[in-house]
């Protein structure tokens, strides 16, 4: 019965003269997500994209609901532009949706095709009456109308060549299609926050690359595998993600040997930003992305962010800046990264944490604490980047 998947794309429709660029990027991403699922046809109209699968419609839905830029989608029945066909199709669709009686419903009609002889309220009224007559019996009114709080809403869209009828609306990520806003480098740890930041960046159209700082043997290869697993989950929402496994061991040793203990975290984060900027500029990334949330830990006070940010001239996006931990954890569960993030494998940010880290560093004091390291910085970074491993991560 359901032969079409109706796709809605929300804010893209509000774009101006470059709207077609966003729509074409979304269609490109849809086609990429459906590779290997099966044969299909695709059609676009104003405000809608239609996918016509040859088979396995549920498999298509599972892939499509992960594509940023898609606000929602509906498995949809199609009928010709005549009222009798619409009546017959409406009964089938509503009966299929209802799993328990008695039930309440309403009909909503959108008449994009103004040549259709009936106006939207007339269609809703006539189809609603037909549904009551077809499903109820003289002895049992198991279906009633409730226009304010119905259990089921039958939706009808009248287009140029066909009528589309559906009840279900399945949420997608929304936002903009990945790649429509350029490319960014995510500083990815094995924790809860940074994968969520990466997902939110993708929703704003940013194509992700990721940099993980690996401090073997202080961090295990299992910590590295954990980050690879997180990247695989994020890659469900895009084509693929290039993951840089940064060699960070010698940098951390140098910080330990040359800097005051309470400044370990601040100076380590400054080195991460320096390394990230060099990798980003080399590979055409336009922005750095982090999982920082204001006040959450010592390195995420405003003073710390200011001092750490001083080493880079690149824009730094912090999608989680104003979120609390509960909000971030809820999003991590929603996107499928939470259970991996809480696995007990330490990353480089946790193994050298001083007992009393400075929480409100001043730039002059930080530069003084970093003084003994200054002559080594360029050499350390060049060596670390040269030893960095590059992986291409795809889901499945």
Curated annotation (Swiss-Prot):
GO terms for biological process: thiamine biosynthetic process; thiamine diphosphate biosynthetic process; thiazole biosynthetic process; tRNA 4-thiouridine biosynthesis. Keywords: ATP-binding, Cytoplasm, Nucleotide-binding, RNA-binding, Thiamine biosynthesis, Transferase, tRNA-binding. Belongs to the ThiI family. It catalyses: [ThiI sulfur-carrier protein]-S-sulfanyl-L-cysteine + a uridine in tRNA + 2 reduced [2Fe-2S]-[ferredoxin] + ATP + H(+) = [ThiI sulfur-carrier protein]-L-cysteine + a 4-thiouridine in tRNA + 2 oxidized [2Fe-2S]-[ferredoxin] + AMP + diphosphate; [ThiS sulfur-carrier protein]-C-terminal Gly-Gly-AMP + S-sulfanyl-L-cysteinyl-[cysteine desulfurase] + AH2 = [ThiS sulfur-carrier protein]-C-terminal-Gly-aminoethanethioate + L-cysteinyl-[cysteine desulfurase] + A + AMP + 2 H(+). Disulfide bonds: none annotated. This is Probable tRNA sulfurtransferase. Pathway: Cofactor biosynthesis; thiamine diphosphate biosynthesis. One of its GO terms (cellular component) is cytosol. ATP binds at residues 187-188, 212-213, 269, 291, 300. The lineage of its organism: Bacteria, Bacillati, Bacillota, Clostridia, Halanaerobiales. Catalyzes the ATP-dependent transfer of a sulfur to tRNA to produce 4-thiouridine in position 8 of tRNAs, which functions as a near-UV photosensor. Also catalyzes the transfer of sulfur to the sulfur carrier protein ThiS, forming ThiS-thiocarboxylate. This is a step in the synthesis of thiazole, in the thiamine biosynthesis pathway. The sulfur is donated as persulfide by IscS.
């Amino acid at each position: 019965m359901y032969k079409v998947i109706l796709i809605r794309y929300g804010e893209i429709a509000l774009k101006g003269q470059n709207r077609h660029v966003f729509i074409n990027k979304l269609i490109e991403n849809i086609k990429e997500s459906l590779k290997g699922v099966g044969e299909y046809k695709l059609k676009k109209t104003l405000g809608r994209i239609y996918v016509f699968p040859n088979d396995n419609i549920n498999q298509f839905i599972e892939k499509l609901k992960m594509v940023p830029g898609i606000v929602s989608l509906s498995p949809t029945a199609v009928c010709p532009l005549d009222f009798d066909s619409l009546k017959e199709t409406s009964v089938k669709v509503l009966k299929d949706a209802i799993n328990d009686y008695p039930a309440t419903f309403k009909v909503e009609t959108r008449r994009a095709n103004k040549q259709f002889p009936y106006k939207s309220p007339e269609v809703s009224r006539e189809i609603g009456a037909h549904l009551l007559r077809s499903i109820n019996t003289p002895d049992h009114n198991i279906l009633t109308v409730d226009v304010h709080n119905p259990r089921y809403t039958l939706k009808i869209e009248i287009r140029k060549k066909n009528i589309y009828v559906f009840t279900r609306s399945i949420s997608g990520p929304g936002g903009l299609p990945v790649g429509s806003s350029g490319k960014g480098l995510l500083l990815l740890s094995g924790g809860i926050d940074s994968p969520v930041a990466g997902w939110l960046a993708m929703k704003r159209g940013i194509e992700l690359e990721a940099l993980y700082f690996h401090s073997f043997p202080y961090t295990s290869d299992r910590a590295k595998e954990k980050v690879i697993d997180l990247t695989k989950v994020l890659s469900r929402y895009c084509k693929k993600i290039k993951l840089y496994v940064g060699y960070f061991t010698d940098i951390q040793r140098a910080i330990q040997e040359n800097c005051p203990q309470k400044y370990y975290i601040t100076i380590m984060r400054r080195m991460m930003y320096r390394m990230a900027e060099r990798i980003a500029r080399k590979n055409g990334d336009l922005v750095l992305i982090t999982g920082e949330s204001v006040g959450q830990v010592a390195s995420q006070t405003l003073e710390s962010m200011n001092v750490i940010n001083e080493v880079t001239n690149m824009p730094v996006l912090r999608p989680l800046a104003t979120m609390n931990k509960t909000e971030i954890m809820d999003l991590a569960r929603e996107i499928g990264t939470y259970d991996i993030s809480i696995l007990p494998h330490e990353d480089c940010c946790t193994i050298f944490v001083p007992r009393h880290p400075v929480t409100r560093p001043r730039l002059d004091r930080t530069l003084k604490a970093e003084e003994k390291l200054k002559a080594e910085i360029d050499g350390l970074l060049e060596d670390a980047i040269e030893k960095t491993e590059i992986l291409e991560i795809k889901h499945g």
